[in-house]
């Protein structure tokens, strides 16, 4: 939202017959836009800083509770603005402490996952309703695509989770320390809204997270990745998942447009501009049984990544109904990992979290009204359908 138009409304304004204008959701505004909003109201820019602290430091959505704001301004704000985050439609709790929320965004739902650990708590955030990329091993991709999320619907996931976790301090839940843009959708296909949302995550008057604790994961939209590097500095993770173009063309179809060499070239350009990544990118590699998990694939991957400073995150595949894959055995993952380590790579095998509530990597689905008609096309072709699609 580049231009903000506010018609100041005073508490004693006379009623009129025309319908009231739609209120501005302050969660849609970054700090620059928030200051512009208050200037247009005839207020000093510092009011934006005050309001943002209430919204993000205290998870406050009630203007009347903002005690250092004078009553006249509070009354005016209630007439022209609101603080509205997505509401929780369904909450599920895993036996390992992971929490998944299905959040209502209009007439659909997206999923957000809170993952507590001993030394941190990570929130996995969605950027789109559904996903257009059709990665074959991902549940979200099978739902089709509807629309991009607004800034308020992205940062609102963090706000809603922080409010819930903050209200549960007596349970010992750890406050959110990290945010990963790894939920539903491809973040680089929604840069217009993802960048302002991440700026609020980083802003001292927002959530105040370190740029090393905000991570964007992408499947390889190369022009958008180049643009990201010119706009904001956050940690980067790449969804590679294959050691060569032949396999990646099949399981990550965007590779047919931006192949591995193009993708890794863009990654290296990003690293040259970034401080958040400390000189290396996280490579995500889902382990699919007898598809991409052989020792020959490990050698190919090492050769593929030899010029890209990275650490490699091996992800045991998390199943969903109708998927034509199997999870690699622990022994195959172990052999694969050892080959990479012999080349000098840092390798981490991701611990599966929340799989008992379909909250693990690749399992998020939500409720998507598919504008791509992907489910109908699959029915017509006689292909298996994820049971969560219908």
Curated annotation (Swiss-Prot):
Disulfide bonding pattern of the chain: 124-361
Cofactors, names only: [4Fe-4S] cluster
4Fe-4S in keyword set: yes
GO molecular function: 4 iron, 4 sulfur cluster binding; metal ion binding; rRNA (adenine(2503)-C2-)-methyltransferase activity; rRNA binding; tRNA (adenine(37)-C2)-methyltransferase activity; tRNA binding
Any one of the GO CC terms: cytoplasm
Domain Radical SAM core, chain residue ranges per copy: 117-356
Name recorded for this polypeptide: Dual-specificity RNA methyltransferase RlmN
Species whose genome carries this gene: Edwardsiella ictaluri (strain 93-146)
């Amino acid at each position: 939202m580049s231009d903000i138009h506010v018609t100041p409304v005073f508490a004693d304004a006379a009623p009129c017959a025309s319908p009231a204008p739609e209120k501005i959701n302050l969660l849609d505004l970054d700090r620059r836009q928030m200051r512009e909003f208050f200037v247009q109201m005839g207020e000093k820019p510092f009011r934006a800083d005050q309001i943002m602290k209430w919204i993000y430091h205290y998870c406050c959505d009630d203007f009347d509770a903002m005690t250092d704001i004078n009553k006249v301004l509070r009354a005016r704000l209630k007439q022209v603005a609101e603080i509205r985050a997505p509401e929780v439609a369904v909450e599920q709790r895993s036996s390992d402490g992971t929490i998944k929320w299905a959040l209502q965004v209009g007439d659909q739902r997206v999923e957000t996952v809170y993952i507590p650990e001993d030394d941190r708590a990570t929130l996995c955030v969605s950027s789109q309703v559904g996903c257009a990329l059709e990665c074959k091993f991902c549940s979200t991709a099978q739902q089709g695509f509807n629309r991009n999320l607004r800034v308020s619907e992205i940062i609102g996931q963090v706000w809603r989770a922080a409010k819930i976790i903050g209200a549960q301090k007596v349970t010992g839940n750890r406050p959110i320390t990290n945010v990963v843009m790894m939920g539903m959708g491809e973040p680089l296909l929604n840069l217009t809204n993802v960048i302002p949302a991440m700026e609020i995550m980083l802003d001292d008057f927002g959530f105040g997270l370190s740029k090393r604790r905000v991570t964007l994961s992408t499947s390889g939209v190369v022009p958008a990745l180049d643009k990201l590097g010119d706009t904001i500095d956050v940690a980067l993770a790449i969804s590679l998942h294959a050691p060569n173009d032949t396999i990646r063309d099949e399981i990550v179809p965007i590779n047919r447009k931006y192949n591995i060499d193009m993708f890794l070239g863009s990654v290296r350009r990003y690293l040259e501009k970034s401080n958040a990544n400390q000189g290396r990118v996280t490579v995500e590699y889902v382990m699919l049984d007898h598809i991409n998990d052989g020792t020959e694939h490990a050698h190919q991957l090492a050769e593929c990544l030899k010029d890209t400073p990275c650490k490699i995150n091996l992800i045991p595949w998390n199943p969903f109904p109708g998927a034509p894959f199997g999870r690699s055995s622990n022994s195959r993952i172990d052999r694969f990992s050892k080959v990479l380590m012999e080349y000098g790579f840092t390798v981490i095998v991701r611990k599966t979290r929340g799989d008992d509530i379909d909250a693990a990597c690749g399992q998020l689905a939500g409720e998507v009204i598919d504008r791509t008609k992907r489910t109908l096309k699959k029915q017509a072709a006689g292909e298996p359908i994820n049971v969560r699609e219908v």
